[in-house]
Regions:
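Acidic, metal/ion-coordinating pockets
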Residues: 2-5, 9-12, 17, 22-157
Length: 157
């Protein structure tokens, strides 16, 4: 005879299991806490500014995020700050850097400079990192003080 469990019963059972399971208890002596912070799709939003509307906004930007990162680091000594990619392209500032100013060797991209300042521990490359071409990408990430992690992109020497 088949056993049928309603969605509500399943969710209630799962919630009960999680609440009673030992991993939900506070850490015991000898255990460590790790706090993970992650950003994604920054799209060159270093400043709290909407370049399309030409006005300051308070919903985007690493400048705004910096205060949150500082708060978390004050709470936790074991905190990692990671980025999930798509940080070099996505707004007029990114286009200006890529098409007008360029990324000469030795120059530091504003997003990379901000990420270095905030102490990012690692980042991956998103699909938009490749939009401006490999020379721009390689020059942009060359100044990163953190590793760029990728399992499916290979740089030929």
């Amino acid at each position: 005879m088949p056993f049928h469990l309603s969605r509500r019963s399943f969710l209630a059972s799962t919630a009960g299991f999680i609440a009673l399971h030992p991993f939900s208890a506070r850490a015991q002596a000898g255990q460590a806490h790790l706090r993970l912070m992650e950003t994604t799709d920054l799209h060159v939003h270093v400043y709290p500014y909407d370049y399309y509307a030409d006005q300051q906004i308070d919903t985007v930007g690493l400048a705004r995020t910096a205060a949150l990162i500082e708060d978390v680091r004050a709470e936790s000594t074991n905190a990692l700050l990671l980025d999930n990619g798509d940080f070099l392209q996505g707004n007029p500032m990114g286009d200006y850097i890529a098409y007008e100013r360029g990324m000469p060797e030795g120059a530091l991209h504003p997003v990379i400079e901000a990420m270095n300042t905030l102490g990012f521990d690692a980042s991956t490359l998103g699909n938009h990192e490749f939009n401006y071409g490999l020379p721009f990408l390689m020059n942009s990430v060359a100044g990163a003080d953190f590793p760029i992690i990728s399992a499916n992109v290979v740089k030929s020497m």
